[in-house]
């Protein structure tokens, strides 16, 4: 801008303009009309050039001021002058310096109300101050929280050390008591053998009565001592179990404070079931590590197993079924129905198991307030008592009478025993969570829900209805924590209705000839009996 101003001053345009005005004034009366007009137009052109340069300088100066600076000056000086100039030019009057009505209007408005920019600046300042105060408060809270966390860590470490020391002392006491009991038994045996050798043969009958009385007294003393010893031993074991549980809880709390991600619990390999939970209550002691395992860790482990079942076990089951069934839709329907039935059977088994445990533990917890907690802890610690094979048989029985997949009988559902057993175990363990996990209800022909399911690769992505489901969605109360998979097609509702009607029409004859699969050409009756694994299928 300074260069343009220097250039304007160095041109001396205004000085030559004044000289031309003086010359025109002297020659005005002697000139003709055309000459006067030419002089006037020449002066107007020169003034326009100067005015253009001045407007360029004005533009550069306004740009240097930024986005907001200079706005008030342009409103108060330039706009009123332009208004007066255009008004005078349109009316044919001379420009009067007292005309600027817009300037007066802007001055009145400026004195009446503050500008929006000032109000915005004040609002921004107030917001900035409040934000700073909030930031300071958050920083103070963060410092205080760090102090509290450090104190809790120190207390947990001290409690852990004290618990370990007490456990070691109790173990030493238990060993000493066992050694004393063994020594007492050895002394008793030695005394009895010495008394037997010292008896004279002539007084055998008379001493026999005394020996019997002494033996009865010794047996009574031995039984009393054994009962006392068993009570002490039981108390010591209970104290060790409680302290071990506290130790594992403190270790879990310290590990969670160091790393928030829970470690998944290893899957129990034992699937055997004892005769009844009442005998298990008397014989087996619940493992403290498993009973105190956090709900979050068990939930994470079960979600991982459920995801592995979808990504690996489901595909393995599909490979087994594709050897017998060529249609992919039928294979996927069978696996989905097997999963749904497995969850249903596992939930029923969990209810019966919990009722049985509650009845077995009732005499031991008369008048206790933590009865439900004891029942839940026992169920969590003894999930391996679940009879998964019985549930597998129930699932296969339900699949045999399902009208969507049971006819025609082209495959034996016992092929899916391993898959069904894994799903039953996962569903049974999910019922022990707080809150329990369950699968979402799904029906063919329903409206596709993007929150619950994802479409399969061969779906019609513009279809609004579900043709059939591939995998169920996992729910926690009413919240979806793991999406399922569904196939969507146009006209899915009518296709599902026609398929159901065809299946029900075929269900009138449950015995139909078996298709040619491998070497077996036998016909099979579709009875509800779940024992079908003995028949060869390939």
Swiss-Prot record:
Q: Where in the cell is it found?
A: Cytoplasm, Cytosol; Mitochondrion outer membrane; Mitochondrion matrix
List Phosphoserine occurrences by residue: 85, 156, 159, 287, 509
Q: Which PANTHER family match?
A: MITOCHONDRIA-EATING PROTEIN (PTHR21771:SF0), MITOCHONDRIA-EATING PROTEIN-RELATED (PTHR21771)
What family does the Swiss-Prot or TrEMBL record give for this protein?
Answer: Belongs to the MIEAP family.
Alphabetized InterPro entries for the sequence: MIEAP, MIEAP_C
Q: Name one GO molecular function term.
A: identical protein binding
An example of a Gene Ontology BP annotation on this entry? mitophagy by internal vacuole formation
Q: Give the UniProt entry's GO cellular component terms.
A: cytoplasm; cytosol; intracellular membrane-bounded organelle; intracellular membraneless organelle; mitochondrial matrix; mitochondrial outer membrane; mitochondrion; nucleoplasm
The protein's name is Mitochondria-eating protein
């Amino acid at each position: 801008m300074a260069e343009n101003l220097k250039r304007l001053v160095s041109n001396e345009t205004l000085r030559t303009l004044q000289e031309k005005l003086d010359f025109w004034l002297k020659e005005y009366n002697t000139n003709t009309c055309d000459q006067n007009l030419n002089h006037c137009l020449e002066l107007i052109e020169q003034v326009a050039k100067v005015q253009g340069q001045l407007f360029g300088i004005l533009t550069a100066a306004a740009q240097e001021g930024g986005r907001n600076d200079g706005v008030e000056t342009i409103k108060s000086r330039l706009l009123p002058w332009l208004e007066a100039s255009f008004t005078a030019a349109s009316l044919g009057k001379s420009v009067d310096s007292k005309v600027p009505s817009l300037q007066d209007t802007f001055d009145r408005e400026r004195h009446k109300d503050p500008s929006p920019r000032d109000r915005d600046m004040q609002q921004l300042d107030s917001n900035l101050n409040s934000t700073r105060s909030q930031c300071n408060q958050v920083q103070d809270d963060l410092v205080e929280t760090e102090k509290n966390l450090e104190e809790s860590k120190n207390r947990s470490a001290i409690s852990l050390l004290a618990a370990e020391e007490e456990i070691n002392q109790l173990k030493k006491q238990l060993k000493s008591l066992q050694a004393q009991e063994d020594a007492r038994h050895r002394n008793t045996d030695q005394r009895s053998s010495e008394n037997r050798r010292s008896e004279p043969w002539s007084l055998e009958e008379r001493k026999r009565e005394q020996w019997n009385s002494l033996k009865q007294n010794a047996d009574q003393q031995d039984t009393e001592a054994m009962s006392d010893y068993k009570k002490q031993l039981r108390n010591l074991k209970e104290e060790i179990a409680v302290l071990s549980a506290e130790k594992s809880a403190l270790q879990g709390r310290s590990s969670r404070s160091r790393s928030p991600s829970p470690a998944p619990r290893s899957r129990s390999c034992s699937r055997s079931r004892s005769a009844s939970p009442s005998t298990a209550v008397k014989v087996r002691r619940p493992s403290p590590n498993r009973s105190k395992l956090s709900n979050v860790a068990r939930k994470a482990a079960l979600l991982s197993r459920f995801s592995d079942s979808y990504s690996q076990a489901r595909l393995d089951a599909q490979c087994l079924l594709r050897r017998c069934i060529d249609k992919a839709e039928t294979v996927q329907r069978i696996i989905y129905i097997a999963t749904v039935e497995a969850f249903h059977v596992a939930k029923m088994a969990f209810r019966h198991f919990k009722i049985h445990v509650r009845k077995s533990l009732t005499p031991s917890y008369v008048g206790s307030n933590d009865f439900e907690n004891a029942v839940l802890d026992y169920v969590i610690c003894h999930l391996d008592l679940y009879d998964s094979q019985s549930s597998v048989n129930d699932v296969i029985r339900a699949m045999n009478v399902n009208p969507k997949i049971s006819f025609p009988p082209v495959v034996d559902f016992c092929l899916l025993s391993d898959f069904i057993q894994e799903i039953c175990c996962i569903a049974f363990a999910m019922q022990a969570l707080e809150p329990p996990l369950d699968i979402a209800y799904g029906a063919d022909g329903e409206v596709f829900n993007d929150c619950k399911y994802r479409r399969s690769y061969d779906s019609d992505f513009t279809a609004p209805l579900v043709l059939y489901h591939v995998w169920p969605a996992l729910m926690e109360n009413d919240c979806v924590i793991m999406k399922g998979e569904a196939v969507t097609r146009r006209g899915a509702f009518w296709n599902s209705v026609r398929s159901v009607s065809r299946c029900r029409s075929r269900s009138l004859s449950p015995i139909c000839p078996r298709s040619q699969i491998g070497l077996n050409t036998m016909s099979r009756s579709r009875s509800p009996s779940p024992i079908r694994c003995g028949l060869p299928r390939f």
